[in-house]
Amino acid sequence: MNDFKKVSESLETALRNEFDFRFATEVSLKEISRWRIGGPAAVFAEPSSINEICALLAFMKNRPEPVVVVGGTSNILFDSDGFGGLVIKLGENFSNFIIEGSRIRAQAGASVPQLVRAVATEGLEGIVHAGGIPGTVGGLVVMNGGTQRRGIGEHVTKVLVTDAEGSIRELNANELQFTYRNSVLKNSETTVLEVELLLKPGNAGELLAELETILDQRSQKFPEDLPNCGSTFLSDPAMYSIVGPPGKAIEDAGLKGLRRGSAEISMQHANFIVNHGDASDDDILWLISAVRKEVYSRTGFVMDCEVLYLSYSGDFRPAHEVADEQWPDIDLVRN
């Protein structure tokens, strides 16, 4: 019996002895990955309540195996070797939201596109710009995601989170420390459970028309026919003012179409890396490192990733850090 199978069976047995809900073993992370990349998770669970999530986290604190909580996976690159612990997925049981006047309470697993359309239909303005962003509300809040130089944090009033030990607490907007594409939640051991937003009254017809325009523009501008994680690199305001957004910098460096294995810098939009079929995590990481080095050599700006890399052992950090460690000597400088 190989080590992975031993880990999987040992952890599953321990979990089943403690909990009475369903666990699955050796579940392919490729099937839940927006990039369609990833090996098997030793054990996989989709809890049905906040209490179950907290209980699982508390239990895993005393186990040697790693644990991670994921939502829509739009900003995650999974290790092609898999994950040697417990993956907790915020699925359909955490996808609800309630609109009460101008205030919205959304579970972390709620779909961003569905939420945006619902609030626009109700005539509430403020987050239509995020209508085409794939993924879930929890992930959007962690990254302070958005478009048009805006972020969801502008409208967040409070967030319910749990720490790595399963203890719940509420954070207000000031405590969340939102900055451009960042928050105190990023790179922390907290998991977002619920989010409260406060929007402003607007015109439903105008908001829905704006949403359709945004979606139409995205469909023309961004690759939708191949698996991808959305924007790979963060837009740096300083770089933006001189060079432009990451996609332009990558395109100007002549890197559109650069390929390794089945992974490619999209010909449609250079800030997207697409999977043509059987790309590996190494393929993606190699492209990330190559792009960073080439753009830096031409512009003097270092582009960081929006994407986080989840290793087999549970290391969870920005993909560019892993990429540069694995591929320190790439030299693609072109005339």
Curated annotation (Swiss-Prot):
Active site: residue positions: 181, 231 (proton donor), 306
Pfam family, one: FAD_binding_4
Bilayer-crossing regions: none
Domain of life: Bacteria
Residue ranges of domain FAD-binding PCMH-type in the record: 36-202
Pathway assigned to this chain's UniProt record: Cell wall biogenesis; peptidoglycan biosynthesis
Gene3D superfamilies (alphabetical): 3.30.465.10, UDP-N-acetylenolpyruvoylglucosamine reductase, C-terminal domain (3.90.78.10), Uridine Diphospho-n-acetylenolpyruvylglucosamine Reductase, domain 2 (3.30.43.10)
Localization, UniProt: Cytoplasm
GO CC annotation: cytosol
Catalysed reaction, written as an equation: UDP-N-acetyl-alpha-D-muramate + NADP(+) = UDP-N-acetyl-3-O-(1-carboxyvinyl)-alpha-D-glucosamine + NADPH + H(+)
GO MF annotation: an example: FAD binding
The keyword Disulfide bond is annotated on this UniProt entry: no
InterPro entries linked to this entry: FAD-bd_PCMH, FAD-bd_PCMH-like_sf, FAD-bd_PCMH_sub1, FAD-bd_PCMH_sub2, MurB, MurB_C, MurB_C_sf, Oxid_FAD_bind_N
UniProt KW keywords: Cell cycle, Cell division, Cell shape, Cell wall biogenesis/degradation, Cytoplasm, FAD, Flavoprotein, NADP, Oxidoreductase, Peptidoglycan synthesis
Top-level EC class: oxidoreductase
Cofactor(s) in the UniProt record: FAD
UniProt EC number: 1.3.1.98
PROSITE patterns (alphabetical): FAD_PCMH
Single GO biological process annotation from the record: cell division
Function of the protein: Cell wall formation.
Family statement: Belongs to the MurB family.
NCBIfam families reported for this sequence: murB, PRK13905.1
Record-given protein name: UDP-N-acetylenolpyruvoylglucosamine reductase 1
Organism of provenance: Corynebacterium glutamicum (strain ATCC 13032 / DSM 20300 / JCM 1318 / BCRC 11384 / CCUG 27702 / LMG 3730 / NBRC 12168 / NCIMB 10025 / NRRL B-2784 / 534)
Gene, per the UniProt record: murB1
